[in-house]
């Protein structure tokens, strides 16, 4: 059986996994109305999906030293199915919160297991396949709001009934294809989670600092983007749609970036992406007028989504077989933790009286210093990373 078909089933799963995380945001108003809760509780429900996504990454990495990649992906599919069904059937807020957290857990387990597995399925095309896989994920972010709009014509719970059915079917297809496909045994030597992670600590740290801090700025920007645009004088409806523009710009970015990640030196390429993102943030700040703001938003959306397949390729292509899953799990957990506070920091700064322009320019300036430091270290040959065949990063 073709590995491409197996990869296709993983693209279907990642679409559903990411859809399950992002679909809660358009439903906040429905939760407030149906369950008679306040904005804070509704916000907590949305947050639980992302907390759940971060929580299992280290345990999932350990599980990959005991069980096959395919089995852990199967578990994530079952968790997604059960979580989606739980949300659809939730009679009250406690059940809804538990089910939402379960959906988040499923996504965290999936990412930690699937990304190394995909890199091992196509070791000579890591960037391209990570780009395609990421593009499938990004399509879910674009589709979430329209799907919810259609579901609301009838009942918002229909979106989760449909998600549960699709997750169960996609998981079954993945299992069937995995059984018929000759899969690599690259991960069989990765049996000591702590030793594997410790052996690659320099590479993990390099990845977490650069991609984590960039994502920190991104989290702070996009979660306040609508309010920022309104503050700049953009109409409320238009401001809301600008987020869709940003996410839509990310769809081709994954594919383009994945291809380039296979061809260009990892660290200089990453620094180029982050620098371009910084330019986009500055353009958003200085832009005036709708056309200029839309153009700047496209730059931000395209460049930030280029980062994700490039960062994954940097790690996965540089890690040796005997530590790939363990080290990637630690990197993934570290990056999620680093970026998580971005929205909180921006919110606190705005509440303290700082202006949006000043906050985002300050964040961009801080990130520019990080890029400069990496450029100096890369010139001196001090940033780890290279081909996996070369052995552990030094």
Q: What are these model-predicted stretches?
A:
Residues 56-68, 253-265, 351:
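Helix-to-loop junctions at the C-terminal end of transmembrane segments
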Residues 97-139:
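Cytoplasmic helix-loop-helix junction between adjacent transmembrane helices
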Residues 25, 201-254, 258:
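Extracytoplasmic gate region of multi-pass secondary transporters
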Residues 71-86, 268-283:
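Structural signature of the two symmetry-related core transmembrane helices
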Residues 124, 132-179:
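Helix-loop-helix hairpin linking two adjacent transmembrane segments in secondary transporters
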Residues 152-165, 347-367:
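A membrane-interface helix-boundary motif in multi-pass transporters
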Residues 36, 68, 86-94, 106, ...:
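Helix-breaking motifs and short loop linkers at transmembrane-helix boundaries and internal kinks
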Residues 318-354, 363:
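A late C-terminal transmembrane helix in Major Facilitator Superfamily
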């Amino acid at each position: 059986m073709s590995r491409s078909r197996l990869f296709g089933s993983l693209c279907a799963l990642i679409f559903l996994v990411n859809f399950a995380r992002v679909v809660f945001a358009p439903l906040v108003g429905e939760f407030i109305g149906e369950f008679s809760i306040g904005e804070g509780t509704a916000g907590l429900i949305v947050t639980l999906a992302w907390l759940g996504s971060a929580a299992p990454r280290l345990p999932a990495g350990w599980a990959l030293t005991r069980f096959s990649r395919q089995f852990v992906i199967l578990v994530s599919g079952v968790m997604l199915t059960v979580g989606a069904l739980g949300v659809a059937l939730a009679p009250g807020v406690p059940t809804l919160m538990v089910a939402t957290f379960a959906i988040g857990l499923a996504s965290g387990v999936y990412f930690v297991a699937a990304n190394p597995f995909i890199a091992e399925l196509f070791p000579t095309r890591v960037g391209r396949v990570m780009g395609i896989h990421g593009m499938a994920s990004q399509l879910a972010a674009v589709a979430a709001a329209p799907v919810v709009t259609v579901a609301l014509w009838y009942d918002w719970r229909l979106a989760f009934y449909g998600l549960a059915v699709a997750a169960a079917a996609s998981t079954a297809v993945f299992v069937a294809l995995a059984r018929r496909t000759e899969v690599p045994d690259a991960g069989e030597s990765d049996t000591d989670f702590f030793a594997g992670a410790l052996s690659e600590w320099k590479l993990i740290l390099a990845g977490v600092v650069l991609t984590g801090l960039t994502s920190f700025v991104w989290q702070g920007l996009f979660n306040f983007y609508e309010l920022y645009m309104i503050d700049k004088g953009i109409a409320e409806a238009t401001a809301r749609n600008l987020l869709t523009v940003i996410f839509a710009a990310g769809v081709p970015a994954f594919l383009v970036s994945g291809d380039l990640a296979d061809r260009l030196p990892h660290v200089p390429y990453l620094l180029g992406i982050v620098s371009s993102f910084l330019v986009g943030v500055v353009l958003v700040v200085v832009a005036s007028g709708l056309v200029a703001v839309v153009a700047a938003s496209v730059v931000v959306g395209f460049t930030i989504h280029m980062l994700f397949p490039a960062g994954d390729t940097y790690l996965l292509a540089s890690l040796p077989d005997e530590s790939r899953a363990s080290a990637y799990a630690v990197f993934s957990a570290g990056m999620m933790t680093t970026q998580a506070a971005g929205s909180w920091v921006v919110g606190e700064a705005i509440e303290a009286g700082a202006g949006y322009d000043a906050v985002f320019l300050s964040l961009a300036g801080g990130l520019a210093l990080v890029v400069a430091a990496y450029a100096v270290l890369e010139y001196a040959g001090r940033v780890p990373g290279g081909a996996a065949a070369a052995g552990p990063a030094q």
